[in-house]
Each structure stands twice: as C-alpha cells, then as structure tokens.
Amino acid sequence: MPENPSGSHARPGDVLIMVGTLKGAFLFTSDGSRKKWTMDGPHFPGEEVYALALDARGGSSTLWAAPGSAFWGTTLRRSDDLGATWSNKDERPVRFPEESGLSLKRIWQIRPGPIDEPETMWLGVEPTCLFESGDGGESWAPVKGFLEHEHRELWTPGNGGLCMHTIVPHPVDRERMLVAFSTGGVYKTTDSGSSWAASNVGVRAEFLPDKHPEFGQCVHKVVSHPARPDRLFLQNHWGLYRSDDWAESWQDIANGVPSDFGFAMAMHPSDPDTVYIVPLESDEFRCVPEAKLRVYRTRDAGASWHPLADGLPQEGAYETVLRDALDTDSADPAGVYFGTRSGKVYGSADDGDSWTLVHEGLPPVVCVKAAVVP
C-alpha cells in the first residue's frame, strides 16, 4: 500500500497517476521503477472529478481538473505546482452562450493541444459540445460549428448523460479532428470545426430499430496513435471496431474477447498496434465476465485479443472499469493503469504483463490519467 504524504512530491522523471473519483481527486507518485507509490489527496473533497490532465508541453507540468458539485456546478481548476495549490474555485471560465439555452453540467475531457501550439486546449462537456481555448485555458468558447449542428435536437443522452468524452485531434492535419459522445456517435471535421459529419458507417446501435443509423450510436471511447493517425479504435455500447480510413468506415475486431461490451480503451504509448480494453458482461450486469478481473490486449491491431490477469483477482471480482478509467504512461516498458467503481487502482510496469494493487478504498473511480513528469 502507498504511503499518504502531506503534499505533492513529484519530480522530473517520476510517474504520476491522476485519479478522479465521485468524492475528489487523488495523485499517486512513483519513481521510474513504479514499485512504490505515494498518495496525495483528496483534492476537491466531496466533488466529482470526471476529467483530469497533465499538460507537459514546453517542459511544464500543469495539472488540470474539472471538479463538480450538484449544488455549485462544475469548475475548471489549474495547478502549476503539481497539486500543492489550485486556481480560484470561484472562476467559471467555461460557459455556454446565454442564447444557446444550454448550461454546463459536467466537463468530461480535458485535451491539451499540439506541442507547437502551447496556448491551444479543448474540452469535451455535457451537454455535448466542444470548447476551445486559444490562451492557455484563461478563456473558453464553444466551437460554433458543433454547437449549432443540425443534428443537435436529435441527439439523446445515454445512461451517463449527453456527454462528449473523446477528443482526437489529427496529429498531422490541423484542420481535422474527431470527437465521440453518447449518444450520438463519432463526428469529424476537416475544416477546423466549421462543419462536422457523422462518421459511424459500420458501427451498430443495438438498442435502436435501425441497427446502423447515420448517427445515434452510443460510442464509449475512441483512441488512436500518432504514428498511424488515420487508424482508429473504438469501444462501443456493444461492439469493438477499427477504422483504417479516419472513420470513413469501421470494421468489427471483437476477435477472442468474452464480450464486445465495455467502456474503457487505451492506446500503447509507442506501439500503434497495441490497445488495451476491459470487457464487461452484458448490458445490464456491467461487471467483468465470470467475476474475473482481466485486461485484454491486442498486439496486432485487433486481429486477436489476449487476457492479462497476472496479479489481478480471478475469483469473486465483480468489478467495473468506466470509460476514462484506463490509461498508459509514456515510459519504456509502458505503464498501464486502471481504476474500478469499487475504489481500487491497479498498475502494471511491464506493458500489462503483470499487475499490482496501487491502492484500494477510494471512492468510485471515474477517471485515471497517467504521465511521466517532465
């Protein structure tokens, strides 16, 4: 079990796991060996934290968090000292225009922009919309082409709300970006956000009369690797897919998984053929199959999947891993981390081959982000 220090002690080269829960955020720090972890938290006690990010562009270490309260709403907080202090909680820079008739319910995703655009950032929010900042997060505005999309009145919330949980900027072509939300599916732009096209060909919507509509799919997560920018992987509400043409079409890759239902999906930091998922049983039960906690990994871009269970409980483990609660660091070998709704955090320092319990007893985990501190 990790120690519980009085403050943040992350140093350059350390690995940081940022964990968002329904009752605050927790920071876990280790050296490069990733064998012993120290915990700092809770930050924002009593508030839900669905989105966290470390912005390491330019050698900086800026933490971003989006704590939310049912009474006081959602805020966006910044720390320039790895969580020792945070920006003013009363600042509310993320707002919908009054004429839109919308109000911010929750921030689901914080995405720093390209390395050579240090002032650019994006947010995915609920009700579903993409916000952009061009001044390092000081001010924010919704992307007009998405806010005013002709499909907006037809989008409906899933069980988790009408939430934009995925933002995938194209690493080469700055005019291209892909987003995903529940329930609406995948949309992409090729003109810097002026227009957006539904991009769900091949992705099924099992819960609709038309199983393959233009939009309306309940996509749970999409990931890509910068070395293969036009290839995408998608975990759907029933369905596991890959696209090789920047979401023009999707192919089923549920080869050897116990269930193609799940939420979480993460990309290996250096291998564009390696992806991690955590399958869940059925639409109603939503726990890992056979009560065995297993991460599944493909090393051939979805042609086959294999369970990773060394160090994970294989009996009586009725666990659930949510859509943003699985991530990888950028170390070599890669670290892989996930959190469960029962408040456990697990980590691997060897590409997922073996696992250890980082911490247990946390509130329900909804977000896990990992990074090497620059």
Protein language model features and the residues they cover:
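Extracellular glycan-interacting surfaces
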Residues: 1-374
